[in-house]
Amino acid sequence: MTPAQNELLKELESFARTAPTAEAVMERIAKLLHEKLTRYNWVGFYLMEGPAFDVLVLGPYVGSFSPTLRIPLDRGLCGAAATSGETVVVNNVGADPRYLGSDLVKSNIVVPIFVTKSEVTKSEAKKRVVAELCIESYFADTFDTAEQKFIESCAALVGRYME
């Protein structure tokens, strides 16, 4: 991570310690990432819902275009990240048929969020994706390894406050 990313992560961690809800943490992350990292054109969260937790529903977001409101788990990059439990990075979305969004977007990263409260074991947490952090950019090759690590740290921060 860059020094600027480390500082931003510290700021988010400080806010999260006193935030009233996980949703407030998500709102702050979306707002600050969108404001401070100008290559991020859309920053938002999708939450697992449905009777079998089989659909992702739009949560807090900040961005320049209308997002998809509901995503079944068998569709798109968000569905792929939710079902695999792994971060999905695509730095050329035009070459990936799973991408569902705007033609203006060139890069996309989706990071699954797991409950990481102390009473949940690591094996239980890994099985239970509860949300996702999704970031889109109008620039190709936005998400390198350092960027991915930073975004995964932001997502993990949310997981500490999810039920």
PLM regions: where:
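Intrinsically disordered, low-complexity terminal regulatory regions
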Residues: 1-66
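Juxtadomain coupling helices with adjacent low-complexity linkers
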Residues: 2, 13, 137-163
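Residues at secondary-structure transition points
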Residues: 3, 20, 68, 72, ...
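Short loop/turn motifs at secondary-structure junctions and domain boundaries
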Residues: 37, 99-105
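Regulatory sensory and allosteric helical modules in signal-transduction proteins
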Residues: 47-51, 59-101
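Short coil/turn motifs at secondary-structure junctions
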Residues: 50, 116, 138-140
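A short, aliphatic-rich beta-strand micro-motif
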Residues: 107-124
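Short hydrophobic beta-strand segments that form the core of ligand-binding sensory/regulatory domains
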Residues: 108-112, 129-136, 142
